[in-house]
């Protein structure tokens, strides 16, 4: 999915508002995903998946850091996310549908925390951005 210049601006502005909360929002999105889509828990058998667990918080920060990297390299996401794509495709073997589920939960989390900034245009831009990230992460599955 191609991001327009307006989409890129919307994503960078919205992610800038996330700021220091990125790790917390990442963890909250993971918790939402585990509660809403319990089958996603199978990829984390070694995690304590209870609310507020240190492992979920740590992984939420990793998710947020990866998205921060993608925002910073929005014009070159395939190179910026190459190692992460390899990890998820070849080592972790995560079913690609899970990226869509996490993207949805992340959108819900952002909408809950940034209601004033989460306009229809920003929502659409973030959705396109997360779809692009998902596409990059699944590109090595082929």
From Swiss-Prot:
- List of residues that carry Phosphoserine: 4, 36, 50, 103, 125, 132, 139
- What UniProt keywords apply to this chain's record, in alphabetical order? Acetylation, Heme, Iron, Metal-binding, Oxygen transport, Phosphoprotein, Transport
Q: Which GO terms describe its molecular function?
A: haptoglobin binding; heme binding; iron ion binding; organic acid binding; oxygen binding; oxygen carrier activity; peroxidase activity
UniProt modified residues of type N6-acetyllysine: 17
Record keywords: Transport included? yes
Positions that bind O2: 59
Per the record, residues carrying N6-succinyllysine are: 8, 12, 17, 41
Q: Which InterPro entries match?
A: Globin, Globin-like_sf, Globin/Proto, Hemoglobin_a-typ, Hemoglobin_oxygen_transport, Hemoglobin_pi
GO CC, sorted alphabetically, is: blood microparticle; haptoglobin-hemoglobin complex; hemoglobin complex
Q: In which tissues is it expressed?
A: Red blood cells.
Query: Which positions does UniProt annotate for heme b binding?
Result: 88
Residues modified as Phosphothreonine are 9, 109, 135, 138
> Any idea which residues bear Phosphotyrosine here?
25
Q: Which GO terms describe its biological process?
A: hydrogen peroxide catabolic process
Which superkingdom does the taxonomy of this entry point to? Eukaryota
| Subunit structure and binding partners | Heterotetramer of two alpha chains and two beta chains.
What function is annotated for this protein?
A: Involved in oxygen transport from the lung to the various peripheral tissues.
Which family does the similarity line name? Belongs to the globin family.
The molecule here is called Hemoglobin subunit alpha
Q: Which organism is it from?
A: Pongo pygmaeus (Bornean orangutan)
The gene it comes from is HBA1
């Amino acid at each position: 999915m191609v991001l327009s210049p307006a989409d890129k601006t919307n994503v960078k502005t919205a992610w800038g508002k996330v700021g220091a909360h990125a790790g917390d929002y990442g963890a909250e999105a993971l918790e939402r995903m585990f509660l809403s889509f319990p089958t996603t828990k199978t990829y984390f058998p070694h995690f304590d998946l209870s609310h507020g667990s240190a492992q979920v918080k740590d992984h939420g920060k990793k998710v947020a850091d990866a998205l921060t990297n993608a925002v910073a390299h929005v014009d070159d996401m395939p190179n910026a996310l190459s190692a992460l794509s390899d990890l998820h495709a070849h080592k972790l073997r995560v079913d690609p549908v899970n990226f869509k589920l996490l993207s949805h939960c992340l959108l819900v989390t952002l909408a809950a925390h940034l209601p004033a900034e989460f306009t229809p245009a920003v929502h659409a831009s973030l959705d396109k951005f997360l779809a692009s990230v998902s596409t990059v992460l699944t590109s090595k599955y082929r």
